[in-house]
A protein has these predicted regions:
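Bacterial N-terminal signal peptides that target proteins for export
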Residues: 6-20
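Surface-exposed, polar helix/loop patches in the mature regions of secreted/periplasmic/lumenal proteins
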Residues: 97-150
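Exposed, low-complexity/repetitive linear segments and helix-based recognition motifs
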Residues: 2, 33, 131-132
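Hydrophobic h-region of N-terminal signal peptides that target proteins for export
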Residues: 21-32
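Absolute protein N-terminus
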Residues: 13-15, 32-35
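Acidic, serine/threonine-rich low-complexity disordered tracts
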Residues: 34-108, 150-217
Length: 217
C-alpha cells in the first residue's frame, strides 16, 4: 500500500468514526432526560394518580383511577437509556367493589421480539418489530421527544391485546405549554405539559361520549 493510499485510508476511517459519533449523539440527544414524577388529578367524583419512580436503574410508571363505581390501575416497567424499552405491563379493572374483575398483562422479550399477552384464561403471543409502547410510556416518550412541533408521530402501542398504530401530533398550546393530541375519529385524548420542565398540567379524555378533564392538584 502506497503512502497516499494509507493517508486516504486513515482519512476515510476518521470520517466514518466522526459520522458514527454524530449519529450516536443525535440518537442520544433525541430524548430529554427523565425524572421521577408524582401527579394527582381530580375531576368531579373521580381521582387519577400517576407516579414515575426509579429503582436500581429500572423505571416504573403506575396509575390509578378511582371512581365510585370502578377502580382502574396499571403498572408498567421499563428501562431508559437513550430510548424507552418496556418489559412488562399489568392492568387491572375492578367494577362495583369486586362484582367484576378484569386483569391483563404483557411481557415483552426484546431478543425474540415476542410479547406474551394474558387475559384471564386467554394466552396469546404477539410478534412485533421496532419500538413498542403501552399508553403510559407512549405519552412519556412524546413528552420527552425533542422534535419540532406540528409533526405527526406514529407509535406502536399495546392496547386490548393488540398492537395498534397510533398517530399523535405535538402543537404549541401557549408560549410555555405543549399539547399532545391523539389523531383518531372517535373519543379524544389531549395532554398538556410545560415545555421546559415537561410537567403535566392537564389531560382531556372523551370516552364513549363522556368527557373527563383531569387537572393537576
Amino acid at each position: 500500500m502506497s503512502l497516499m493510499e494509507k493517508i486516504l485510508n486513515v482519512t476515510r476511517m476518521s470520517l466514518i468514526y466522526k459520522i458514527s459519533l454524530t449519529f450516536l449523539f443525535v440518537i442520544a440527544s433525541n430524548l430529554f432526560s427523565i425524572n421521577e414524577e408524582n401527579y394527582r388529578f381530580k375531576y368531579k367524583e373521580s381521582e387519577f394518580k400517576v407516579n414515575i419512580t426509579n429503582l436500581n436503574d429500572k423505571w416504573n410508571i403506575t396509575y390509578e383511577i378511582s371512581h365510585p363505581f370502578f377502580k382502574l390501575s396499571q403498572d408498567t416497567q421499563f428501562s431508559y437509556t437513550n430510548l424507552i424499552q418496556v418489559s412488562e405491563v399489568k392492568r387491572k379493572l375492578i367494577v362495583m367493589g369486586g362484582l367484576r374483575k378484569i386483569e391483563e398483562s404483557y411481557k415483552i422479550d426484546h431478543v425474540t421480539k415476542k410479547i406474551e399477552y394474558i387475559k384471564g384464561q386467554l394466552t396469546e403471543t404477539l410478534q412485533y418489530d421496532g419500538a413498542i409502547y403501552d399508553d403510559l410510556t407512549a405519552h412519556l416518550y412524546l413528552r420527552l421527544l425533542n422534535i419540532q412541533t406540528d409533526e405527526e408521530i406514529t407509535l406502536n402501542v399495546l392496547e386490548r391485546g393488540k398492537i395498534r398504530q397510533k398517530k399523535f401530533i405535538k402543537t404549541i398550546s401557549s408560549p410555555d405549554t405543549i399539547k399532545i393530541k391523539e389523531k383518531k375519529e372517535k373519543d379524544k385524548f389531549e395532554l398538556f405539559f410545560k415545555d421546559n420542565s415537561k410537567e403535566i398540567l392537564k389531560v382531556i379524555q372523551n370516552v364513549n361520549g363522556r368527557e373527563f378533564i383531569w387537572e393537576s392538584h
